[in-house]
């Protein structure tokens, strides 16, 4: 019986991984850096979130980019104190882009809001020692395009703050998102084209998300390899956008592709973000947290990821 095409692609990645394991075992010594995106925890305290991550052996956190105004959001010193008390470092910040701060908006006040928001988050990311700030080129939850110029408006608006990424030493990580949620930049290829259009050293990286990739990419593993050195963070959830191990996501092939890519190094992160299904996940950030459910979600996800990684790496 011949293999299906996706199986052939899986096998190519497996063969490359096994060759790496056999010929360059030193490249597998370091494990992947496991982080967690905390905005899906809803309206719980950062202290509670940090304790949960510590219990599950997660050493990094992707902080909710919640500086929606000058007086809103985390304060750096307080946040650092809480995280340090639980042995957690900041991997990066998850930028949140709605219709109110849409880089591609046809309304100038909304683009200005995006500029002001990015200025605040770039500074905060740097204060926290974060490596990257996630940037979405268009509003999440708006799958219908404004017009034919929205891509260029987004590029032009992000370009206004591009110098700040360089000045603060923060990577702008462009996230492709599935067509059910956004009107532009849905694939790794789209993200690379967007980066090329911005054409700035401060905007050179990609934040991929396997949940979106299963809808938009021909093969997740191949797309990760296509992202190459631009890939700085990978959001994870299973096929049902739940805990890892609860669906049919091919986690082994993803892990092998990341090792082939050399992703197991400083400044590169694997970040679970299981939010549940739906066309607009942002309401999760305002939800009332169920601590027991979240404890279980994090514990099972972290344990399953490390179990599969240990099995593959040996």
What is each of the regions a protein language model found here?
Residues 53, 83, 121, 125, ...:
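Generic structural signal for hydrophobic
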Residues 40-42, 65-67, 96-99, 137-141, ...:
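Active-site-proximal loop/turn and secondary-structure-junction residues that shape catalytic pockets
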Residues 50-70:
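Basic, amphipathic N-terminal segments that precede the first structured/catalytic domain
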Residues 79-97, 153-168, 192-198, 256-260:
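Alpha-helix-loop-beta-strand connector modules within alpha/beta enzyme cores
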Residues 60, 64, 173-174, 206-210, ...:
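Generic enzyme active-site microenvironment
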Residues 63-152, 264-281:
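Structural motif corresponding to the early beta-alpha repeats
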Residues 71-78, 106-117, 145-156, 182-190, ...:
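Alpha-helix N-cap and loop-to-helix initiation/capping positions
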Residues 1-35, 43-57, 185, 189-205, ...:
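Histidine-acidic metal/acid-base catalytic patches
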């Amino acid at each position: 019986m011949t293999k299906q095409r996706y199986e052939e692609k899986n096998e190519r990645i497996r063969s490359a991984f096994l060759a790496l394991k056999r010929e360059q075992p030193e490249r597998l010594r370091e494990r992947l850096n496991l982080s967690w995106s905390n905005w899906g925890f809803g309206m719980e305290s950062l202290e509670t979130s940090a304790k949960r991550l510590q219990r599950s052996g997660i050493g990094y956190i992707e902080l909710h980019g919640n500086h929606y105004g000058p007086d809103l959001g985390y304060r750096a010193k307080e946040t650092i104190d809480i995280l340090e008390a639980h042995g957690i470092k900041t991997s990066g910040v998850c930028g949140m882009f709605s219709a109110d701060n849409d880089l591609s908006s046809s309304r100038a006040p909304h683009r200005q809001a995006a500029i002001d928001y990015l200025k605040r988050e770039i500074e905060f990311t740097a204060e926290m020692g974060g490596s990257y700030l996630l940037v979405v080129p268009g509003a999440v939850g708006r799958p219908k395009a404004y017009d034919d110029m929205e891509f260029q408006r987004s590029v032009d608006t992000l370009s206004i703050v591009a110098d700040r990424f360089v000045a603060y030493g923060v990577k702008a990580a462009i996230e492709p998102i599935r067509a059910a949620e956004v009107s532009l930049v849905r694939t790794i290829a789209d993200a690379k084209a967007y980066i090329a259009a911005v054409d700035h050293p401060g905007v050179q990286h990609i934040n991929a998300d396997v949940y979106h990739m299963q809808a938009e990419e021909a093969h997740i593993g191949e797309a990760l390899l296509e992202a190459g050195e631009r890939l700085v963070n990978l959001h994870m959830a299973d096929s049902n956008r739940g805990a890892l191990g609860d669906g049919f996501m091919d986690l082994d092939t993803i892990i092998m592709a990341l090792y082939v890519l050399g992703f197991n190094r400083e400044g590169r992160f694997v970040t679970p973000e299981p939010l549940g299904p739906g066309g607009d996940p942002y309401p999760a950030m305002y939800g009332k947290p169920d601590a027991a459910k979240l404890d279980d979600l994090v514990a099972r996800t972290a344990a399953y990821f490390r179990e599969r990684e240990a099995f593959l790496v040996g």
